[in-house]
Amino acid sequence: MRPGTSICRTGFPFANIATDFDEGSKSFRIRNGVLPLPFFPNDGIHTRNVLKQNKSKEGNYDMLYVETSTPGLKGQSGGPIFDTNGHIYAMQVQTNHIPLGFHPISEYDGKSIVENQFLNVGIGVHGKLLQQIMRDHHISFKVEGDSSEEEQYIINE
């Protein structure tokens, strides 16, 4: 995936999912009246790839992420980030707030208030890292398309 690729992320950000734990079956059950959940997609573009300087906790994976032009919403974490063909490129994990470097001052109720300006971007675990983890845990999956495209990475500490 290259910067500028149209993407979409899905999830259930506005849901209050009430569950109970069933000791007998050792499983969670969704309470009556919760379903159907409100499904919510939001679109954007792939802005860049980010390779963190540090490795995973176990030390065996380079931490590679996809950054998107739109933030993920609470409730979309763990959901897919995919292109217009439905190919999954990443898994949403967090939203970053990048300072824009200017701070306009506004007046409110007779007081001056500094407004820090940020760009909110979504962060997802890159599909290459997901594939590596699934291979290591013997989880089968299918890859479509040409993954030999040269990709650019931003090195981030």
Tell where the protein language model's regions lie, with residue ranges.
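Serine endopeptidase catalytic core focused on the charge-relay Asp
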Residues: M1-Y61, Y65-S69, T84
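A short, hydrophobic secondary-structure junction motif
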Residues: V34-N54, T70-G78, E115-R135
